[in-house]
UniProtKB/Swiss-Prot annotation:
GO BP terms, alphabetized: allantoin catabolic process
Organism the protein comes from: Homo sapiens
Gene: ALLC
Protein name according to UniProt: Probable inactive allantoicase
Superkingdom, natural source: Eukaryota
InterPro entries the UniProt entry points to: Allantoicase, Allantoicase_dom, Galactose-bd-like_sf
Protein function: The function of this enzyme is unclear as allantoicase activity is not known to exist in mammals.
Length: 391
């Protein structure tokens, strides 16, 4: 997962120089491209961040806020198409900053042809980014040819990071900066009165098993924000065991032998009080019905069932949402009718029948550390359901 991408909320806060191409290009979600004959009033158009040839002391650098904050596993410094003008050396620093203590950073606006102003330097200096931890020391880069354009760096750190400083020495161009890792929420800052999405990928939720992902991975459905298209969801192949002629049961649910499923490890153990299943964009290929179950697994148990391809005794799974009819291109909200809490779970399984696509899954509730502080009575599994039309 690219934690810095603009598609998940990554943002450039500052760059020393953006003369040929702005730093915002670094965090585009698409791959860089090259337009041989395209120029701007400042020079050759390049799909990346490119600074002017430096003629003053120092080096160029930029600061970005991660869209998904958490543990960084590695970087890809992509200099594709920068062959005679790539940055020859790079280093990367990081910090874990509290959002409410950040100084006010001026909005960047249109940057091509410009350098940072004294006011912008003064504002960014309050972050003391010179002192941030080094995740990648100064390292030489390879040119942006097809065989050498991607420069990969592994990171051995378990710390949570919120901001990145990318240093280039002394100047030049970089096409993309990919920051790979896993989300990690600061649960100590969670409002105990407000439910959180315990499966969100931004907080550390992750898919740990699935039956089929022909047209889209289940990790997509726990992504940041709403789905952008059908490609931004989980979609399976059509099951081949469907009967030649389909029939419904007395509740209008299709009578079919097969199903597809995906299992998610929650970002934090907790109880689920609100479920949202969104089939936006899936109009001719939404599932007929679904159900959601939960269980508690230790790390060792999870590793074992992954090896067994999620063959888990049925009694381990506890129902969170019974078999429920779904509608195409629709957001389905399921609210508990009671204030009593359900059992704490670590994993959730979404089952769809017989096949099809889902754009988003939200499992809102309370992390277990907060649940223990709340009164607990006999759990109930009654749900109310509402539908929210997608535009």
């Amino acid at each position: 997962m690219d934690m810095a991408s603009e598609s998940v909320g990554g943002k450039i806060l500052f760059a020393t120089d953006d003369f040929f191409a702005p730093a915002e290009n670094l965090i585009k979600s698409d791959s860089p491209c090259f337009k041989e004959h395209e120029y701007t009033e400042f020079g050759k158009w390049m799909d990346g961040w490119e600074t002017r040839r430096k003629r003053i002391p120092g080096h160029d650098w930029c600061v970005l806020r991660l869209g998904i904050q958490g543990v960084i596993r590695g970087f890809d410094v992509d200099v594709s198409y920068f062959t005679g003008d790539y940055a020859p050396r790079v280093s990367i620093q990081a910090a874990n900053l509290e959002e409410d203590k950040l100084p006010e950073i001026p909005e960047r606006g249109t940057r091509t042809g410009a350098a940072a102003t004294p006011e912008e330097f003064e504002a960014i200096a309050e972050l003391k980014s010179d002192d941030w931890s080094y995740l990648v020391p100064m390292t030489e880069l390879k040119p942006g040819n097809p065989a050498s354009g991607h420069n990969y760096f592994l990171v051995n750190s378990q710390q949570r990071w919120t901001h990145i400083r990318l240093n280039i020495f002394p100047d030049g161009g970089i096409a993309r900066l990919r920051v790979f890792g896993t989300g990690q929420k600061d649960w100590t800052a969670t409002d105990p009165k407000e439910p959180a999405d315990l499966v969100a990928i931004a907080f550390g939720g992750v898919c740990v098993g699935f039956s089929n992902a022909k047209f889209g991975h289940p990790n997509n459905i726990i992504g940041v924000g709403g789905a952008k298209s059908m490609a931004d969801g989980w979609e399976t192949a059509r099951r081949l065991d469907r009967p030649p002629i389909l029939e419904n049961d007395e509740n209008g649910i299709l009578l079919v032998p097969g199903c597809e499923w995906a299992v998610f490890r929650l970002a934090h153990p907790g109880v689920i009080t609100r479920i949202e299943i969104d089939t936006k964009y899936f109009e001719g290929n939404a599932p007929d019905s679904c159900k959601v179950d939960g269980c508690i697994l230790t790390t060792q148990e999870e590793e074992a069932v992954i090896r067994q391809k999620w063959i888990l005794p049925a009694h381990k799974w506890k129902p969170l949402l019974p078999v429920t009819k779904l509608s195409p291109n629709q957001s389905h909200l399921f609210d508990s009718l009671t204030l009593e809490l359900q059992d704490v779970i670590t994993h959730a399984r979404l089952t769809i029948v017989p096949d099809g696509g889902v754009s988003r899954l939200r499992l809102r509730g309370f992390p277990s550390s907060i649940c223990l502080l709340r009164p607990r009575e006999k759990p109930m599994l009654k749900f109310s359901v509402s539908f929210k039309a997608n535009p």
